[in-house]
Amino acid sequence: MPILLAVNLAHSRLPVLSSVLVAGVLLLGLPAASAAQGVAGTVPEETIRSQVPAPSVRAAAAIVYNTETGDVLWESNSGAQRSIASITKLMTAVVFMEESPDLSAVVTITREDVRRASTTYLRAGFKVTKGDLLHLTLIASDNAAARTLARVSDHGSEAFVARMNSKAEELGLTITRYADPSGLSNDNVSSALDMAKLLTYVSGDVRLTDVMQKQSYSVPVVGRRAPILIRSTNQLVRNGDVDVVAGKTGFIRSAGYCLATLLRLPQGGPPVAVVVLGATSNAGRFREVRSLFDWFAKAAPDLLGHAVVPFGAD
């Protein structure tokens, strides 16, 4: 007689292929791995676990997500709601670009834009283009730039945040709530799973991915002789030894160190989203994302059903 097995994996640190429930039918006398074969589009959990041990991750929440199929390949507390700090700026950029703005239009920075901005290269009175504000927002995580994008949008700052929340709802980001465009508010919250889904959406806009792949950028300021030179806050981009399709860092005390990335194997194929929230240090977030990506590279033949050379192999 078949037995229906439903396992809640929402807080598991083992490789999984569903963010909430995996259902399988176990026939008497058959091992769990055999029954798992009956779940369409999945891989036997036991096979993955025994062949490629999952890495140890200290971040409060993390996920490895297949952007092509929507499968959760590995997770730890990926559905937990947490403060996301400047990862908020991903949605800021999405909503701003959906207005099809004139990126060459020049904007004057106001005192309110830079007030208590914490991290900014801008000063009141600076004149920069909307396109350069986008670069400052995504590359340097400039809070004043993100605020300015919202202010100069079609409907102003307050309506902009409302549109960020509407877009989150449209994309099915059920855990996500936005309170401001910069990420400085503790009330910008989401989950690792929701951010993986948002990265998947972002991957379809080359205007955004092209910006996030830049290691550095020069921002001209109208009437100022020297440009502003900025570097990516994403160490994986700066190092250049892994193919980063898109990514955003974030940190405030309530969020811890956060990193949402879209990475591609050297052999190509669809990118995988790797997100860590609440890492214990700046270096730790990059180390743990890289550890999870290296695990994915080794586990990919099982997870994706084709041969892949482990990342970094000779």
What is the meaning of each model-derived region?
Residues 36-193, 197-206:
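Active-site-adjacent loops and short helices of periplasmic peptidoglycan-processing enzymes
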Residues 10, 16-17, 32:
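Intrinsically disordered, low-complexity segments
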Residues 28-33, 99:
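Hydrophobic membrane-targeting alpha-helices
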Residues 1-13:
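N-terminal secretory signal peptides that target proteins for export/translocation
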Residues 37-59, 131, 156-314:
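Penicillin-recognizing serine hydrolase domain
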Residues 18-29:
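Bacterial N-terminal signal peptides
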